[in-house]
Amino acid sequence: MKVDYEQLCKLYDDTCRTKNVQFSYGTAGFRTLAKNLDTVMFSTGILAVLRSLKLQGQYVGVMITASHNPYQDNGVKIVEPDGSMLLATWEPYAMQLANAASFATNFEEFRVELAKLIEHEKIDLNTTVVPHIVVGRDSRESSPYLLRCLTSSMASVFHAQVLDLGCVTTPQLHYITDLSNRRKLEGDTAPVATEQDYYSFFIGAFNELFATYQLEKRLSVPKLFIDTANGIGGPQLKKLLASEDWDVPAEQVEVINDRSDVPELLNFECGADYVKTNQRLPKGLSPSSFDSLYCSFDGDADRVVFYYVDSGSKFHLLDGDKISTLFAKFLSKQLELAHLEHSLKIGVVQTAYANGSSTAYIKNTLHCPVSCTKTGVKHLHHEAATQYDIGIYFEANGHGTIIFSEKFHRTIKSELSKSKLNGDTLALRTLKCFSELINQTVGDAISDMLAVLATLAILKMSPMDWDEEYTDLPNKLVKCIVPDRSIFQTTDQERKLLNPVGLQDKIDLVVAKYPMGRSFVRASGTEDAVRVYAECKDSSKLGQFCDEVVEHVKASA
């Protein structure tokens, strides 16, 4: 490969208009006002190519999205060949390259930093390997321009093959990146993966699960309402619903807040984050009947929350904790029926923000192991993948998935090959189908929704039945502005404070006063503030409980 640095210099000068801005790459990648992202897109495009070269030309994904953020924002993140998030050791490179492009006074200064990265990772630019990139974007108005900034150097300078998926959900980008590489590794002669592969696979798994139970009705409720946050989830979901293999009567499903063509409506008074935060129905939805089920996606359809309205018109949220416990209940039972409860390990992974009632229910009622990790999907995903054969994780905000180990797949295949037509076989087939219904690469609103619908139908549970498995403890999350958030240092997966010294002891004394009380403090990742979480048995005392903790935090800050 011959790198055309003269062309790269021209593209740098033409593209990198945003200068002297510090950029940070977090769990969500880069994310800020869209008007400030041209420079970041340019550098991220180069980094994605280098990542593919490092991995001998495997497909690397790049998604342009800002998820549940306001429509003025946008962002970008890189996806590994297996559909997982960018390797943690490469996150500093993303920042290094972006900030080099931002603060360099000329192209040569940027080129020096680029050369350092290439040398450090021992990437051979004289190779015959062709880098492969999969790109996708959400429905934001700024996305087409930012895509041009992203891909400007990929083919013209680095001779990369770029597969542009157009407008897709974030989980579709993850899935298609993974599938493209699996086909490449297996020597599959089929063309590169497409979104049609996505729809065919997940609808197929959904239908097979119902066929296994000989269930004709696909929904356990008379009607399902889906709020797609006026984001890319709307048109992509409608493609699924229009598929000839989708076997749910049209009158049973209604998609609302599906105006992805009106940029300023994105996430406005709708979507998963709005519903969870405000504990209310989204804009455009009024209670139709108390036996309907509702769900909301976020802007790029990688998270989902459910809810219903009871006969007294009271709103009930079924969040990520409720989703993980539903799946744990269902899959634990299937393992027992298949007599595999001692062979395969199932567990639920949570963060400190999980409601204490959900943790108690999983441990004491389901008798299922629970792990707690630091906040952030990469921590949850790693724990689920490394500690369990069936690792279930959902953040309370509705982002999550289930990871099935290689041992799980080997065991199920082996047991199915020798089992007879009995209860064992039904459970084994259920486990196999369910593992295919889940998008294991990342949280996926569409896939997770299908899995919830299938579980409720098989268990013959109504939304109220699901909700009544356990009752959430009253809880509150408040933001407390502090002069310097860096002094708040935690341990025990962010549940205890090390510093400021003595503050944790004061919090413990407050917690002890409230039955079933729990509280923790952690620094914000983006601003000089800390988040104070509190929960207790008595909702009338919750405000007082939280205020006491906040007072101690302010005094220590």
Curated annotation (Swiss-Prot):
EC class (word): isomerase
Modified residues (Phosphoserine): S67
Enzyme Commission no: 5.4.2.3
Binding positions (Mg(2+)): S67, D298, D300, D302
Pathway the protein contributes to: Nucleotide-sugar biosynthesis; UDP-N-acetyl-alpha-D-glucosamine biosynthesis; N-acetyl-alpha-D-glucosamine 1-phosphate from alpha-D-glucosamine 6-phosphate (route I): step 2/2
Disruption phenotype: Results in undivided strings of cells and growth arrest after approximately 5 division cycles.
GO CC aspect terms: cytoplasm; nucleus
A Pfam cross-reference name: PGM_PMM_I
Localisation per UniProt entry: Cytoplasm; Nucleus
Gene3D superfamilies: Alpha-D-Glucose-1,6-Bisphosphate, subunit A, domain 3, Alpha-D-phosphohexomutase, C-terminal domain
Family per similarity comment: Belongs to the phosphohexose mutase family.
Protein name: Phosphoacetylglucosamine mutase
Organism, scientific name: Saccharomyces cerevisiae (strain ATCC 204508 / S288c)
Underlying gene: PCM1
